[in-house]
UniProtKB/Swiss-Prot annotation:
Chain positions recorded as NADP(+) binding sites: 220-274
Effect on the protein of changing residue 264 to R: Decreases catalytic activity
BP GO terms, sorted: arabinose catabolic process; cellular response to oxidative stress; D-xylose catabolic process; glycerol to glycerone phosphate metabolic process
Job description of the protein: Glycerol dehydrogenase involved in glycerol catabolism under microaerobic conditions. Has mRNA binding activity.
Class of enzymatic activity (EC top level): oxidoreductase
InterPro entries: AKR, AKR3A, Aldo/ket_reductase_CS, NADP_OxRdtase_dom, NADP_OxRdtase_dom_sf
Subcellular location(s) of the protein: Cytoplasm
Name listed for the protein in its UniProt record: Glycerol 2-dehydrogenase (NADP(+))
Keywords: Cytoplasm, Glycerol metabolism, NADP, Oxidoreductase, Phosphoprotein
Length: 312
């Protein structure tokens, strides 16, 4: 029997009391005018949650699309992220992001990665880059800085009014435990944005975050070319049975698991498709849960932060 699709309108609550739409538009790898068109399409289609980052180099396009959409700013949940070369100056970095976005504030500001890149290795004054050492490795600094120091600075930002909440991204359970137990910690992160999809379900991390009142956000929810979920036989069979597209199946699985989902696309039809969900049967839901158990887990995004252990 065909499933009944509907636009997702579900809202989750941050530990600040703020409301966050469960499905948002991701803009990673959306370049220049593509990002503008994607955000404009999304907002006109009813999205009210847009996720960007300084390192995406598209904040100006995202901000212009928000302005041109005609949707009141207070109706849109906007997230951006602190890049790793600016861990020592998050307020300066946030000011720069706000200037590029053309906004007075963002709703959520995330530490993009727990590792700091040493700005001493930056070339051509390009702060939004991945500086490398002479041997070509990332200029990761674990000697002079750590993410706890970054968090101690970030947790003061909501008081400025420049962001309504702060959180983290790509944090493992161990790194979250270290942050929460640190002497200078006064604020539990509002969110932890991590890679999640049926080949990397992150059950333990999701449960830990929920136990601490941290909202989980899923990036790369449809996998990528390295994790071709939309061609998985289990996904295709469920899609065929319910007369929906494979993307509907995967996004609906995420939504039923109860966290924020951030599908990325610059294709207008896919942007609209990614907000349409249906209720999976218990049998189908469990079948998707079992994909990683049968095939093994596969991470799509795994940059080398050596010697820092990001995912342990």
């Amino acid at each position: 029997m065909p499933a009944t699709l509907h636009d997702s309108t579900k809202i989750l609550s941050l530990n600040t009391g703020a409301q966050i739409p469960q499905i948002g538009l991701g803009t990673w790898q959306s370049k220049e005018n593509d990002a503008y068109k994607a955000v404009l399409t999304a907002l006109k289609d009813g999205y009210r949650h847009i996720d960007t980052a300084a390192i995406y180099r598209n904040e100006d396009q995202v901000g212009q699309a928000i302005k041109d959409s005609g949707v009141p700013r207070e109706e849109i949940f906007v997230t951006t992220k602190l890049w790793c070369t600016q861990h020592h100056e998050p307020e300066v970095a946030l000011d720069q992001s706000l200037k590029r976005l053309g906004l007075d504030y963002v709703d959520l500001y995330l530490m993009h990665w727990p590792a700091r890149l040493d700005p001493a290795y930056i070339k051509n004054e390009d702060i939004l880059s991945v500086p490398t050492k002479k041997d070509g490795s990332r200029a990761v600094d674990i000697t002079n800085w750590n993410f706890i120091k970054t968090w101690e600075l970030m947790q003061e930002l909501p008081k400025t009014g420049k962001t309504k909440a702060v959180g983290v991204s790509n944090f493992s359970i161990n790194n979250l435990k270290d942050l929460l137990a640190s002497q200078g910690n006064k604020l539990t992160p509002a969110a932890n944005q991590v890679e999640i999809h049926p080949l990397l379900p992150q059950d333990e991390l999701i449960n830990f975050c929920k136990s601490k009142g941290i909202v989980v956000e899923a990036y790369s929810p449809l996998g990528s070319t390295d994790a071709p979920l939309l061609k998985e036989p289990v996904i295709l069979e469920i899609a065929k049975k319910n007369n929906v597209q494979p993307g509907h199946v995967v996004i609906s699985w995420h939504v039923q698991r109860g966290y924020v989902v951030l599908p990325k696309s610059v294709n207008p039809d896919r942007i609209k498709t990614n907000r349409k969900i249906f209720t999976l049967s218990t049998e189908d839901f469990e079948a998707i849960n079992n994909i990683s158990k049968e095939k093994g887990e596969k991470r799509v995004v795994h940059p080398n932060w050596s010697p820092f252990e990001v995912f342990k």
